[in-house]
Amino acid sequence: MKNKKSKNQQFAVIGLGRFGSTVAKTLFEKGEEVLAVDIKEEVITEAHEYTTHAVVADVTDERTLRALGIENFDVVIIGIASDLEASVLCALTCKEIGVKKVIAKAENLKHKMVLERVGADEVVIPEMEMGEKMGARLANPL
């Protein structure tokens, strides 16, 4: 018998580049509630198709995050990696206002270390992780 979840989780995906938009689409397709947030209006216009809600906002401002009710989400995924300051400020503020779980994307190991120090619960470096998986697969073909 398959174990069903009693309720959908609520996810906020901040930063809708390739990583963030893919995470948001996948969660939405799996039936989860997804709030998409980005500073670019054209990105948010597109995001309405694959999210529950999509909002243009500056996530470096604590008042903005509070107005979005970000602390009420089960998981916040921060896909901003190219702007180190925005990424770190967003992660720090999310943790300070009570977000239970923050997952953040980093560009490199130093960025990862900073995100961990400000309280991110999980930090991913997608390019590195995929490179490691591919290398392992190529070294051990079936």
Model-predicted segments: where are they?
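Cytosolic regulatory regions of ion transport systems
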Residues: M1-L142
